[in-house]
Amino acid sequence: LALVLLSACSTSSPFKSLTAGPCSGEQKQLVSAHISSQISAISKQDWPLAYSFAAKSFQDSVDIFSFEVVITGSYPMLINNQGISFGKCEIKATSIFQEVTVNSGSEKSELLYKLTSVDQKLGVEAANIIEQSSALTT
């Protein structure tokens, strides 16, 4: 596993130069893995790890305590998630936008993640709730 991680770091970054339009397959895979890792840390309430996936610009303006307060207050579906799926991934200017559906049992939430790549390192800048709906139960 360490060899795979090391070899992944040594290759040229798929985020070196961003071109507007749909994400490439490799970009989508890396973005999905980054968001999945952050959501996994959030669901375990491992705030230092979850915070480490945030963009440096986000970390410069929001401290870890405020990050935890925002997540627990506005994004409880990330803590209680029972699965996530990924929709469209698109690049606009210097940002990467990824649609994410979070299933938290009786509720599904559509979020739009905004990521940036600084020095070829991905970071989550924002996650906005687009839509929340209750699952129909019969």
Name each model-derived stretch:
Residues 21-23, 29-40, 44-97:
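Short solvent-exposed beta->alpha transition segments
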Residues 6-8:
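C-terminal motif of bacterial Sec signal peptides marking the signal peptidase cleavage site
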Residues 83-138:
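Exposed beta-sheet edge and beta->alpha loop/turn motif
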Residues 15-19:
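N-terminal, intrinsically disordered, polar/charged segments of Gram-positive cell-envelope systems
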Residues 1-2:
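Sec-dependent N-terminal signal peptides
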Residues 10-12:
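Bacterial signal peptide processing site
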